């Protein structure tokens, strides 16, 4: 069981953010989302929006639907055969599930970083260059080089890899591989970055590095992160949504959720009474 239930534990790398959530219009607006696996309903009528330039954490006990909900945001559930999503997800006013939307393009606008780092079996350079190439984002080799460098810099990896760009991505450490995957997502100019427990396969030092990076990236992107760690949610997010049994129980500023939750179920979860 995950024992990491307290936001203020010793050794926290960043202090819990006390910033108020931004008032900007939502980057993604989800209305009345219902998700089914065959006849089983995994998400029940969830309405939730995600602002730009902020990190929103999705927390809740195992099986409560965090990953299922996250996957709705870039239509990754389309790839699961018996999965059906109902409701509206608006991005810039357009429903992402509309037939006219190309899911491949959508996934470049809404990038995703997974639990286990999953670099392509290619060089460090090609891991980053692949997306810009297929999306036609570079008009010359110099352009592509510049995108690769900028993405690696933004992901805080450039200094560590600049002299071995032709080495395989898989030759990097786990934490470096996860930053490579973040750089790969950034390279196609996303507006939103989804992270599904991005640190769960990493040691504390690599985790701290990724958390610092998330804090840096939120100045530019709308970030949604699923995490089992209360400490992590408190450290990196400005807003937190608590899920239970496929329902959204409470959503608010991270500080409020952890210090003064409105719902008893939220309080029970964050104080470690269940989950
Ligand atoms: N591919 C699938 N087919 C059928 N049911 C699924 C599938 N994926 C998830 N589920 C079910 O949907 C529910 C929500 O699962 P989900 O993985 O979204 O929860 P979670 O909160 O992310 O869990 P965890 O924290 O353990 O990763 C669970 O009951 C799970 O068994």
From Swiss-Prot:
Entry keywords, A to Z: ATP-binding, Cell inner membrane, Cell membrane, Membrane, Nucleotide-binding, Phosphate transport, Translocase, Transport
State where the protein is found.
Cell inner membrane
What the entry lists under PROSITE patterns is as follows: ABC_TRANSPORTER_1, ABC_TRANSPORTER_2, PSTB
The UniProt catalytic activity note for this protein reads: phosphate(out) + ATP + H2O = ADP + 2 phosphate(in) + H(+)
Q: Principal localization?
A: membrane
EC number assigned by the record? 7.3.2.1
What the entry lists under InterPro entries is as follows:
AAA+_ATPase, ABC_transporter-like_ATP-bd, ABC_transporter-like_CS, P-loop_NTPase, PstB-like
Q: Does the keyword Disulfide bond apply?
A: no
Q: Some GO term, biological process aspect, for this entry: which one?
A: phosphate ion transmembrane transport
Q: How does it sit in the membrane?
A: Peripheral membrane protein
Q: Which residues form the signal peptide?
A: none
An example molecular function term from Gene Ontology annotations: ATPase-coupled phosphate ion transmembrane transporter activity
What's a Pfam family this protein contains? ABC_tran
Q: Would you say which domain of life the source belongs to? A: Bacteria
| Record-listed ATP binding positions | 60-67
Q: Name one GO cellular component term.
A: plasma membrane
The yes or no answer to whether the keyword Ribosomal protein is present is: no
Query: Which family does the record assign?
Result: Belongs to the ABC transporter superfamily. Phosphate importer (TC 3.A.1.7) family.
Function, as annotated? Part of the ABC transporter complex PstSACB involved in phosphate import. Responsible for energy coupling to the transport system.
Can you name this protein?
Phosphate import ATP-binding protein PstB
């Amino acid at each position: 069981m995950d024992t990491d239930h307290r936001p203020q534990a010793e050794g926290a790398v960043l202090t819990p953010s006390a910033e108020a959530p931004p008032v900007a219009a939502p980057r993604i607006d989800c209305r009345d989302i219902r998700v089914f696996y065959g006849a089983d309903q995994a998400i029940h009528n969830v309405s939730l929006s995600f602002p730009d330039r902020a990190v929103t954490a999705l927390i809740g006990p195992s099986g409560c639907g965090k990953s299922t909900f996250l996957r709705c945001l870039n239509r990754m559930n389309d790839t699961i055969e018996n999965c059906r999503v109902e409701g509206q997800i608006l991005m810039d006013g357009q429903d992402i599930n509309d037939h006219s939307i190309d899911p491949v393009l959508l996934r470049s606008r809404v990038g995703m970083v997974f639990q286990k780092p999953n670099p392509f079996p290619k060089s460090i350079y090609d891991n980053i260059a692949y997306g810009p190439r297929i999306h036609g984002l570079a008009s010359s080799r110099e352009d592509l080089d510049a995108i690769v460098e900028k993405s690696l810099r933004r992901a805080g990896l450039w200094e560590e890899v600049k002299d071995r760009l032709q080495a395989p991505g898989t030759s990097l450490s786990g934490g470096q591989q996860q930053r490579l995957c973040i750089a790969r997502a950034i390279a196609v100019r996303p507006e939103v970055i989804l992270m599904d427990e991005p640190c769960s396969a990493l040691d504390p030092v690599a985790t701290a590095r990724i958390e610092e990076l998330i804090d840096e990236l939120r100045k530019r992107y709308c970030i949604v992160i699923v995490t089992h760690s209360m400490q992590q949610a408190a450290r990196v997010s400005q807003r937190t949504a608590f899920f239970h049994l496929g329902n959204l129980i409470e959503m608010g500023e991270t500080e409020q959720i952890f210090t003064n939750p409105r719902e008893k179920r939220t309080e029970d979860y964050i104080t470690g009474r269940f989950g």
